[in-house]
Regions:
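Short, structured coil/loop segments at alpha-helix boundaries
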Residues: 10-13, 42, 82-84, 216, ...
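Generic local-structure boundary detector
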Residues: 28-34, 63, 67-69, 82, ...
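N-terminal, Lys/Arg-enriched amphipathic/low-complexity engagement segments
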Residues: 2-51, 103-123, 127
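Helix-turn-helix/homeodomain-like alpha-helical modules used for DNA recognition
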Residues: 91, 97-160
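Acidic, serine/proline-rich low-complexity intrinsically disordered regions
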Residues: 3, 144-378
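Proteins with a high burden of low-complexity, intrinsically disordered sequence enriched in S/T/G/P/A and R
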Residues: 2-16, 56-60, 65, 74-77, ...
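Hydrophobic alpha-helical segments, chiefly the membrane-spanning helices
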Residues: 38-62, 67-90, 97
Length: 378
């Protein structure tokens, strides 16, 4: 039936695999291109560096830049590389709980209130700019970069700068008026560490937030957007988004608190309305919370949307299901599962082909018998 025999299975030997890796390295090192320094990646590609650090769960900008250069800009590959590096690190300390009210704020905005204590601080953002290609970047040099930095610093009014200080939470205004949903007795007090304990459903809120902080940015944005469009979530109002640095404290062997450094984070608190119930006729407001490494405001806001959606419970929509959200936004796992389809599966597929060929032959034999029987009766 098959005139051409099936091809022999391909043997991916070590020699062939090593040659393929050399070709991949050659593609990155094409002649005529200038190598990109790791310091340049850290300084000029901070958005993608922050994304890789957050999804890998490791605050190390230099290592994230190395992983990104090694992966040729593939964020999924870079996250897997950085997570692999993270597994060999020794956990020497556990930091104290960080109070983000003590954040050194670089950016702080609220869409819920026009005026907030301390004022709105736009900080570094492109939210209000047009998304047009900047052709000047094509001719950018070290000299033009230095000139632009010098001009920016010269234009600063040092006298107008306010003293450095921290800001209280905008949502504390609602809490002071008793407008936020009161805390319930079943809300956890112990933090579930997803790097040490497996997740079981229904998962505690701390585990859900940790999973979202390490989730793939595009995946949680898609699910959060589905919730905004009515598929199991809501359309919140941004109580506050803040970007800044927070101090990291640990306790040394003598029991003394030590500041070992700081990390840059983005924090978002979304305000949503609660549906009125007969048992509780007061339409309180509820908060959805998100916090992630670096400046990744989209991710933090989407975390808050999904935090609120998963607290609603039920299985009516993907954004509500804890299991669906946590499993399907885990970028490293989903990337690995999809790309594993490219690995050799010759034995299984050959078995399927043999079964199919046998079934086709049996069908042809039955058809031939029926045709012969019909011919004998005619």
């Amino acid at each position: 039936m098959f005139s051409t025999p099936p091809p022999a299975p391909v043997q991916f030997t070590r020699k062939v695999i090593a040659a393929a890796e050399r070709v991949a390295r050659f593609e990155r090192l094409r002649r005529g291109t200038t190598p990109i320094a790791v310091a340049s990646l850290r300084g000029q590609f901070r958005a993608v560096i922050d994304q890789v650090m957050g999804e890998a769960g490791l605050y190390a900008s230099e290592h994230a830049a190395l992983a990104l250069a090694q992966a040729e800009g593939d964020t999924h590959e870079a996250v897997v590389i950085l997570r692999a590096f993270r597994t060999i690190l020794v956990r020497r300390y556990t930091s104290a709980v960080i109070d983000t009210t003590g954040m050194f704020v670089e950016r702080r905005i609220s869409s819920a209130f026009r005026e907030i204590p301390g004022g709105q601080i736009l900080g570094p953002t492109r939210d209000y700019s047009q998304r047009l290609l900047d052709a000047a970047l094509a001719t950018e040099t070290a000299a033009t970069v230095d000139a632009a930095a010098t001009a920016f610093e010269a234009g600063l009014d040092r006298k107008a700068l306010k003293p450095l200080r921290t800001f209280g939470k905008v949502t504390s205004l609602l809490r002071a008026e008793g407008l936020l949903r009161p805390a319930t007795e079943d809300e956890e007090t112990r933090v579930h560490d997803i790097t040490r304990e497996p997740i079981r459903f229904p998962a505690p809120r701390s585990a859900r937030l940790q999973s979202l902080a390490r989730a793939e940015t595009g995946a949680i944005m898609a699910l959060a957007y589905s919730g905004m469009r009515g598929q199991g979530g809501d359309h919140p109002t941004i109580g506050e988004v803040r970007v800044g640095r927070v101090a990291v404290r640990v306790t040394d062997a003598r029991g003394r608190a030590r500041v070992i450094g700081s990390v840059r984070v983005t924090e978002a608190e979304n305000i949503s309305k609660i549906k009125v119930k007969k048992k509780d006729p007061v339409p309180y407001m509820s908060l959805g919370y998100g916090l992630c490494f670096g400046q990744n405001e989209t991710k933090a806001i989407c975390m808050g949307i999904l935090d609120r959606s998963m607290r609603l419970g039920g299985d009516g929509a993907p954004a509500i299901s804890q299991e669906f959200v946590i499993y399907h936004t885990e970028g490293a796992d989903s990337w690995g599962s999809v790309n594993s389809l490219k690995l050799p599966a010759h034995v299984e597929f050959a078995s399927d082909l043999n079964l199919l060929r046998a079934a086709v032959e049996r069908k042809l034999a039955r058809d031939a018998e029926k045709a012969a029987a019909a011919a004998s009766h005619s």
